[in-house]
């Protein structure tokens, strides 16, 4: 779907009115071609990547803070019965972007004196004795050494045969827990594991005395989110009606399948629409439904200090190497870094240092990127999990839009050198 320049400017004006900025005057000063260039980038992504990545729609939000511009653009259709064009009310599964909401919930509890992130799993969840030494901080920065339940054959088989299965948190954790009949490789250094976030969810519920859903609802309200929802399982019809079709297209084997592996445990799901999949398999690790507009609001609120106090935000942005798990001051080109469920990266062609996260479920991808040096937040979402090695959403869309903004002097010229 094409979105004409005048329509894009009008949409930006509506968004800006709520944010207190005046995008159209800024856009006019840069020439009328900027909206068309951004729209063309989305159209090109769909045209070039539709068959490769299995996508049919994309939603982009660009927020340069006060005074703007705020730009929103969409392309493609939702794939539902009426095949309606994607618009500002369309919703996506945002996958592991759920994790930084969860980290914020933990840190808010710390600020309230209800827990300390240097307390251990053993302190809060003594039933998991094998991991009793692991600190909450290590759960959130992925240095716990705990295997990933979502890559196990046991969980994969259930997901492949019953998309509506209601997982309990204990069922997910048990798939990764060491036993004589369940020996998984014990990762060292930094290792990405969804099990960390299921454990953190249990700690949140125990420390707060509330369900994770209720804790998240308070966070959503504090950040001013209107289109963000969490259900540990089946979503209400009113929410699902706004979620577009999302396809599973990735034939790659699960990490813990026996080698050699010819067919993925999840192969029965290939080509299927994952829109109505029960998201209890993801829970606190990845079950939020939202859209790029609300995710940008969240990122602004989080980094603006409106979600957790400054001390806790400093803890959240304290980094370890994604290669070694050891503390680092900042990311470099060869060594991305991880905070408490946040990623910092350095790429010269993407403006130097920036914060980001890419969330992914079996049918959706959603990325946020935040450049403090430009006061720029970009969020984008699309509707597939593509074959391994084919995902070009971030580079194709965010990279091109960043260059468009720089060429239009909306942001400063992009540096070509920096910390490496």
Could you tell me what each predicted segment is?
Residues 35-92, 114-116:
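Short, conserved catalytic-motif segment at the N-terminal edge
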Residues 1-11:
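Bacterial N-terminal signal peptides that target proteins for export
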Residues 324-326, 385-420:
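Short, gly/Ser/Thr-rich active-site loops of penicillin-recognizing serine hydrolases
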Residues 133-354:
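Short, surface-exposed loop or secondary-structure junction motifs
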Residues 357, 365-385:
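Short, well-ordered beta-strand elements
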Residues 52-56, 82-139, 182-195, 283, ...:
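Short active-site loop at a secondary-structure junction
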Residues 10-21:
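Bacterial N-terminal signal peptides
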């Amino acid at each position: 779907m094409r979105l004409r320049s005048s329509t894009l400017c009008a949409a930006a004006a509506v968004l800006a009115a709520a944010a207190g900025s005046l995008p159209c005057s800024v856009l006019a000063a840069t020439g009328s071609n900027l909206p068309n260039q951004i729209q063309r980038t989305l159209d090109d992504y769909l045209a070039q990547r539709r068959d490769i990545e299995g996508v049919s729609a994309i939603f982009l939000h660009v927020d340069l803070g006060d005074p703007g511009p705020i730009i929103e653009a969409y392309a493609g259709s939702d794939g539902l019965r009426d095949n309606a064009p994607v618009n500002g009310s369309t919703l996506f599964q945002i996958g592991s972007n759920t994790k930084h909401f969860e980290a914020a919930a933990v840190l808010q509890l710390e600020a309230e004196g209800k827990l300390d992130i240097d307390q251990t799993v053993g302190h809060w969840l003594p039933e998991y004795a094998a991991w009793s030494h692991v600190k909450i901080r290590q759960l959130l920065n992925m240095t716990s050494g705990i295997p990933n339940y979502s890559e196990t054959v046991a969980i994969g088989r259930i997901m492949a045969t019953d998309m509506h299965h209601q997982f309990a948190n204990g069922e997910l954790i048990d798939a990764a827990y060491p036993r004589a009949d369940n020996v998984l490789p014990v990762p060292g250094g930094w290792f990405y594991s969804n099990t960390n976030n299921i454990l953190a969810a249990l700690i949140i519920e125990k420390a707060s005395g509330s369900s994770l859903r209720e804790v998240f609802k308070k966070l959503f309200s504090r950040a001013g989110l209107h289109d963000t929802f969490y259900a540990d399982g089946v979503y209400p019809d009113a929410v699902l009606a706004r979620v577009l079709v999302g396809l599973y297209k990735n034939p790659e084997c699960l990490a813990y399948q026996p080698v050699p592996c010819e067919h993925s445990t999840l192969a029965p799901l290939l080509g299927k629409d994952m829109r109505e999949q029960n998201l209890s398999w993801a829970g606190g690790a990845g079950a939020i439904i939202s859209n790029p507009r609300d995710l940008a609001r969240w990122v602004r609120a989080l980094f603006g200090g409106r979600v957790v106090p400054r001390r806790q935000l400093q803890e959240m942005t304290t980094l370890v190497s994604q290669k070694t798990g050891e503390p680092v001051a900042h990311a470099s080109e060869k060594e991305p870094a991880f905070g408490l469920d946040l990623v910092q990266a350095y790429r010269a062609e993407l403006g130097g240092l920036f914060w980001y996260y890419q969330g992914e479920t079996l049918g959706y991808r959603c990325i946020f990127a935040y450049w403090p040096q430009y006061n720029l937040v970009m969020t984008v979402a699309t509707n597939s999990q593509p074959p391994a090695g084919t995902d070009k959403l971030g580079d194709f869309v965010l990279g091109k839009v960043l260059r468009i903004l720089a060429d239009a002097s909306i942001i400063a010229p992009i540096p070509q050198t920096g910390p490496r």
